Amino acid sequence: MQEFDPMNRGFASYRSPRTIALVGKYHSLEIAESLRRLAEYLYERGVSVFIERETAEHIGKIVDLSRWVTCGFNDIGAHADLAIVLGGDGTMLNAARRLARYCVPLVGVNQGRLGFMTDIARDDMLTCMDDLLDGRFAPENRMLLAAEVTRDGKEVASNMALNDVVVDKGAIGRMIEFELFIDGEFIYNLRSDGLIVSTPTGSTAYSMSAGGPILNPTLTGIALVPLCPHALSNRPIIVNDNTDIELRIVNADDPRVHFDGQVTLDLERGDCVRLRRSEHTICFLHPPGYSYFAMLRQKLQWSERPKGP
């Protein structure tokens, strides 16, 4: 139901979906009624509805979901025209990593706090569905990072990240020391609490809290943001998205690598973490009138006047 644009590595447009998967925040029972109402509404509009299996296992304890098919992410990727995610940014991150390889677009309904990636407020959920089903949402492609960890020359792990990949010192208080290489060229030796490697999507997450720049999602760049560097001259830098990045662990007691803050792997001294732009993208579908800067203005409370006593 979508038109793939190979030049942009993503979707240029989409048409009215016939099969929609619903993915919810696993341990948030308060979304149960919203998910049931949404499933009912889509069914009445003639849409085939799938409910992600773990979502159904948790939400099904509160509301009756027995009339709908439940399936895992692999089946969603094989059969769904798009997925609607009910939750916060964390739920979107998990769904994006699981579905990016299948080119399934995502729509976010905000059931969390800030919700930089979940455009639709819960109270507006059903009123927005007509625009979605009639093909009036706007597609936007977001890049992901692909990472692999090698130890003694052998790959021991790999994963993708939509927001960021973070290499840090772990639970031990001492700094981590590693070497940074870009396209095979030595850049610097960094002693710090860690390094955030962020996509434009992730630039409003951990990276922003660490002093990194906000990158418009349409940019093709990767931000490298040191965490509390020992040398204050180690500042955030932006590199091209076709860059190969390599981090070599020189000295650390408990080093770790984190993918979107959700998947963690213990590292060892001498390990290498290699990062590049993933061959996969994820497509977000935005409602009519969506503006990235309007979203930032609202979420970050730009230009807000102080409230009086």
Curated annotation (Swiss-Prot):
NAD(+) binds at residues 89-90, 163-164, 174, 191, 193, 204-209, 262. It is an enzyme of class 2 (transferase). It comes from the Bacteria. SUPFAM superfamilies: NAD kinase/diacylglycerol kinase-like (SSF111331). The active site is at residue 89. This is NAD kinase. Belongs to the NAD kinase family. The keyword Coiled coil does not apply. Its EC number is 2.7.1.23. It catalyses: NAD(+) + ATP = ADP + NADP(+) + H(+). Pfam families: NAD_kinase (PF01513), NAD_kinase_C (PF20143). NCBIfam families: PRK01231.1 (NF002306), PRK02155.1 (NF002561). Gene3D superfamilies: Probable inorganic polyphosphate/atp-NAD kinase, domain 1 (3.40.50.10330), Probable inorganic polyphosphate/atp-NAD kinase, domain 2 (2.60.200.30). One of its GO terms (cellular component) is cytoplasm. It is found in: Cytoplasm. One of its GO terms (molecular function) is NAD+ kinase activity. The keyword NAD applies. Involved in the regulation of the intracellular balance of NAD and NADP, and is a key enzyme in the biosynthesis of NADP. Catalyzes specifically the phosphorylation on 2'-hydroxyl of the adenosine moiety of NAD to yield NADP. Keywords: ATP-binding, Cytoplasm, Kinase, NAD, NADP, Nucleotide-binding, Transferase. The gene is nadK. The lineage of its organism: Bacteria, Pseudomonadati, Pseudomonadota, Betaproteobacteria, Rhodocyclales.
